């Protein structure tokens, strides 16, 4: 039985993905009821951050601690994968001392190479190409508020980035339609579009993408590492702000999500996070519960190999 990792959503079957989402909501109910559940006492999560993040660190560290385990945080100063010691060597050593590893980095090939030589499950906390953990939280949040997302229409407004790529995978696996609204030159990569043409439609207009949507999602215009492009991107994305006027084009019960941190007055209007259909704060909290369900799944799957 092969070691299981979570580098993209498609490392899970659709059945496993749905099971993890249901389990996340169950763990959330337990947590809110102050029920203690510590199946992983003595287990250690290694968190390797080459890209910093408040939400990712807190949610993973709190999650493993609530399970009775502990976490080790490695900042960019502590380890530089592939710069100095080869990634393959780092993976062999680090994984020999841990039970599970989460990596948040730039190139997706870094997590792939690390996982190839790891003795324990590896979780992609974010790469330039994928953000699957955020999708777990988003899918859980939609399910909790509106039920099944199958057959629904999701509008992605903004850059064809890692979040957009993971949404395309989710559309394929969960059976919803994804309408991407991006400025010309900022659409998703052609290879992703070609693979998911059956469930993804691209528009160079935010309004066209938002029409009849059941969920509208956006992200910052310039991600970490794109700061030099900020002014150029502000100009390109000027008509791609999510605001009340855009929400009015969607279904009346359309939800709004943003993975945070948000730049009010840029990709969203000043009050959008507090819009009556915004579920951003539930979405943020669900990072904790979704990742707990994921870690439980991977650790239990790995235990079957012993």
Swiss-Prot record:
Q: GO BP, one example? A: L-arginine biosynthetic process
Q: Which cellular component terms (GO) are annotated to the entry?
A: cytoplasm
Which Pfam families does its entry note?
OTCace, OTCace_N
Q: In which pathway does it act?
A: Amino-acid biosynthesis; L-arginine biosynthesis; L-arginine from L-ornithine and carbamoyl phosphate: step 1/3
Positions binding L-ornithine in this chain are: 162, 219, 223-224
Specify which residues bind carbamoyl phosphate according to the UniProt entry for this protein.
53-56, 80, 104, 131-134, 259-260, 287
Q: What class of enzyme is it?
A: transferase
Instruction: Give EC number(s), comma-separated.
Output: 2.1.3.3
Q: Catalytic activity annotated for this protein?
A: carbamoyl phosphate + L-ornithine = L-citrulline + phosphate + H(+)
Against InterPro entries, the record matches this protein to:
Asp/Orn_carbamoyltranf_P-bd, Asp/Orn_carbamoylTrfase, Asp/Orn_carbamoylTrfase_sf, Asp_carbamoyltransf_Asp/Orn-bd, Orn/put_carbamltrans, OTCase_ArgI
Q: Indicate yes or no for the key word Transferase.
A: yes
Q: Which domain of life is it from?
A: Bacteria
**Which compartment or compartments is the protein found in?**
Cytoplasm
Which key words are in the record?
Answer: Amino-acid biosynthesis, Arginine biosynthesis, Cytoplasm, Transferase
Is Amino-acid biosynthesis there in the keyword field?
yes
GO MF terms held by the record: amino acid binding; ornithine carbamoyltransferase activity
Q: Which PANTHER family does the record match to this protein?
A: ORNITHINE CARBAMOYLTRANSFERASE, MITOCHONDRIAL, ORNITHINE TRANSCARBAMYLASE, MITOCHONDRIAL
Q: Which NCBIfam families match?
A: orni_carb_tr (TIGR00658), PRK00779.1 (NF001986)
Function in brief: Reversibly catalyzes the transfer of the carbamoyl group from carbamoyl phosphate (CP) to the N(epsilon) atom of ornithine (ORN) to produce L-citrulline.
What family is it from? Belongs to the aspartate/ornithine carbamoyltransferase superfamily. OTCase family.
Its name, as the record gives it, is Ornithine carbamoyltransferase
Question: Which species?
Answer: Acinetobacter baylyi (strain ATCC 33305 / BD413 / ADP1)
């Amino acid at each position: 039985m092969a070691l299981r990792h979570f580098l993209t959503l498609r490392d899970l079957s659709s059945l496993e993905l749905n099971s993890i989402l249901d389990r996340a909501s169950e763990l959330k109910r337990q947590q809110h009821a102050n029920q203690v559940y510590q199946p992983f006492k003595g287990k250690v999560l290694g968190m390797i951050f080459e890209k910093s993040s408040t939400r990712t660190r807190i949610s993973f560290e709190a999650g493993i601690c609530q399970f009775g385990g502990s976490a080790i945080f490695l900042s960019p100063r502590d380890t530089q994968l592939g710069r100095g010691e080869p990634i393959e060597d780092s993976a062999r050593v680090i994984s020999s001392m841990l039970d599970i590893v989460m990596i948040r980095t730039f190139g997706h090939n870094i997590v792939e190479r690390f996982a190839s030589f790891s003795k324990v499950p590896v979780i992609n906390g974010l790469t330039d190409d994928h953000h699957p953990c955020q999708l777990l939280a988003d899918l859980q949040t939609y399910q909790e508020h509106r039920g099944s997302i199958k057959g629904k229409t999701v509008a992605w407004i903004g850059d064809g980035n890692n979040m957009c790529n993971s949404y395309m995978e989710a559309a394929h696996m969960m059976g919803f339609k994804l309408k991407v609204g991006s400025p010309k030159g900022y659409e998703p990569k052609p290879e992703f579009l070609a693979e998911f043409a059956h469930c993804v439609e691209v528009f160079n207009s935010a309004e066209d993408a938002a029409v009849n949507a059941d969920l509208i999602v956006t992200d910052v215009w310039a991600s970490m590492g794109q700061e030099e492009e900020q002014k150029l991107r502000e100009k390109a994305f000027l008509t791609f702000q999510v605001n009340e006027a855009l929400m009015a084009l969607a279904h009346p019960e359309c939800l709004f999500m943003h993975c945070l941190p948000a730049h009010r007055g840029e990709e969203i209007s000043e009050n959008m996070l507090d819009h009556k259909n915004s579920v951003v704060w539930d979405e943020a909290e669900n990072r904790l519960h979704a990742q707990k369900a994921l870690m439980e799944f991977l650790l239990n799957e790995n235990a079957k190999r012993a």
